[in-house]
Regions:
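Conserved Radical SAM active-site core
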Residues: 1-116, 126-154
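Residue-level detector of flexible, active-site-proximal loop/helix-junction positions
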Residues: 124-127, 175
């Protein structure tokens, strides 16, 4: 939704397609997948499926994805889990929206999908100047990044002690991207 006008048509393709998740590693929100699609994944045991969770709060997920069915789509994860489908997850973090306590809640909730959910990465939302008609979002500051990393590292320790794995990971952007910390 943040693409500049005048680019080639293939760049505007919405890649929320389970086949692209399985074949190319794309992340899907599950919002446009039918029960038939989920049944096909289960039947053929297509793994891994990469899921963009954003949050485990159904109401907030609807708001974030601007889709009234986005919260219900989380029930599809239950079905994948029950069938033993391997999954990877990501949380695209938006400052003041799904960070802080919401992030901690989501991390706790996602543990119910262990061991099928092998890992979850937390990445900052990518912001461009092409945001017309979209929710206003602020970039993370260096201090914000430190807070996010502290939450992730805290949970990594908990999961390592409890399960022998880290499970939750910070995307490289939290460490390396100077453009992430605008205004600092």
């Amino acid at each position: 939704d943040q693409m500049p006008p005048g680019m080639r048509e293939t760049l505007y393709f919405k890649d929320d397609d389970s086949r692209l998740s399985f074949l190319q590693g794309n992340y899907v929100t599950l919002t446009n997948m039918s029960e038939h699609d989920i049944d096909r994944i289960v039947k053929y045991h297509l793994s891994p499926i990469n899921i963009s969770f954003q949050t485990m709060n159904p109401q907030l997920r609807c708001k974030m994805l601007n889709n009234r069915f986005a919260g219900e789509a989380l029930k599809k994860v239950d079905k994948l889990f029950e069938a033993g489908i391997t999954m990877n997850g990501q949380i695209v973090l938006c400052k003041g929206v799904n960070d802080g306590e919401e992030l901690e809640y989501s991390i706790r909730e996602l543990t119910k999908y262990l061991p099928c959910l092998e890992s979850v990465s937390v990445v900052p939302v990518g912001l461009t100047k092409y945001r017309e008609g979209l929710e206003p979002l602020q970039p993370f500051t260096k201090e914000d990044a430190k807070e996010v990393l502290a939450i992730i590292e805290k949970w990594q320790k908990v999961f390592y002690e409890e399960y022998g794995l880290h499970f939750i990971h910070a995307g490289d952007e939290w460490y390396r991207s100077p453009s992430l910390y605008q205004g600092t």
